[in-house]
Structures are given as C-alpha cells and as structure tokens.
C-alpha cells in the first residue's frame, strides 16, 4: 500500500518541449457544474440540481518568473495550446519506504489573459498566462481519473463515460 503525501516534482511541457522559468505552483481547474434551484410543492425547502456533463468556465493559470519567449508563446490567442504537466507523487509504503507514482495532466485551451507582470529590481516579474480550458485529462499511474472534452462532449471518470446513457437517447 502506498500512502500519497505530496507532489515531489513536476514539469510543464508545451507541444512536447519543456517550459523553462515557470513559477512555483499551478492550481488545476475546478470541475463545477451549473445548477438550478429546485423548490415547490412536496419539497421541504430547496436544493441545487446539477446538470451532468456541463461545466462552468475552467481556467489554468501558467505562472512564469519573468516574461520570456516561452511565456510569450502562450500569449497567441488564435491557436489552442497543448500543455502537459508531468510529475511524481511521493508516498510511503507500509514498510516506511518512499515510492513515487507518476501523475500527468493534459490540457488544451485558448489564451484568455496575459499578465506580463511587474518590474522591480532584484525581483521576479510574476508573469502569468491564463488559458480557457477546452480539454483536460488527469491520470495517475497511467490510469485516467477524469477526462473532459467540452468540444466533443466527453466526460469520463475512472475511464467510464458518464454521459453514455444520455448520448444513447439523443
């Protein structure tokens, strides 16, 4: 048994090429579905009813220490960008040994915002490029955990298509 404890290391790649000069951390996007409030006769109060397969806007901010060629390449708003985040999850075995498990996040999206940052002597610029996500895949140890393709209408959890029954009806 492996008890996961932290991300030991990660790297970000654009079209297979490592991006240099990134910032320290990246927050992965939330999977939040739009809801409707349900209330009325026979219902005690109200509740939020999610719409499976539909998701609110998802963003991924890619931080850089300074404005660079790599950062500027992501500022192109006419072309979807393909990023791959590869890392290692550190964990402890039953015997107390440390083991690493691969994690991979694949993202495709269009540039939504470019923040060149600030200029201050002896400091980083805190440059950031924000992508509007069209596709995301999160894998751990080669197994897909979550996959969402907003354009092609696919949403899978653990490799199981969550919308298969709905697709069969349409």
Model feature map: region roles:
Residues 110-170:
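Mixed-charge, glycine-accented linear interaction segment located at domain edges/termini
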Residues 65-67, 86-90, 108-110, 134-136:
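Beta-hairpin (beta-strand-turn-beta-strand) motif
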Residues 69-72, 92-97, 137-143:
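Short, cysteine-centered beta-strand-loop-beta hairpins and adjacent loop/turn segments enriched
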Residues 74-105:
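Short, acidic/charged, Gly/Pro-enriched secondary-structure junctions
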Residues 1-69, 108-119, 160-168:
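Solvent-exposed edge beta-strands and adjacent loop segments
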Residues 19, 41-45, 81, 86-90, ...:
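Eukaryotic N-proximal low-complexity acidic segments or loops
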Residues 52-56, 77-79, 97-101, 121-125:
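A generic structural micro-feature
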Residues 59-63, 82-86, 104-106, 128-132:
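Beta-strand secondary-structure signal
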């Amino acid at each position: 048994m492996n008890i996961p404890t932290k991300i030991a290391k990660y790297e970000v790649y654009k079209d297979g090429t490592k991006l240099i000069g990134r910032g320290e951390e990246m927050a992965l996007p939330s999977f939040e579905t739009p809801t409707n409030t349900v209330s009325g006769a026979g219902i005690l109060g109200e509740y939020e009813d999610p719409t499976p397969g539909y998701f609110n806007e998802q963003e991924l901010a890619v931080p850089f220490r300074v404005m660079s060629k790599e950062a500027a390449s992501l500022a192109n708003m006419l072309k979807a960008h393909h990023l791959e985040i590869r890392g290692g999850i550190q964990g402890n075995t039953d015997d107390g040994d440390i083991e690493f498990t691969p994690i991979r996040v694949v993202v495709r999206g269009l540039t939504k915002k470019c923040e060149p940052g600030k200029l201050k002597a002896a400091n980083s610029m805190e440059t950031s490029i924000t992508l509007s996500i069209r596709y995301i895949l999160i894998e751990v140890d080669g197994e897909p955990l979550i996959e969402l393709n907003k354009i092609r209408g696919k949403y899978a959890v653990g490799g199981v298509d969550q919308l298969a029954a709905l697709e069969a009806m349409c």
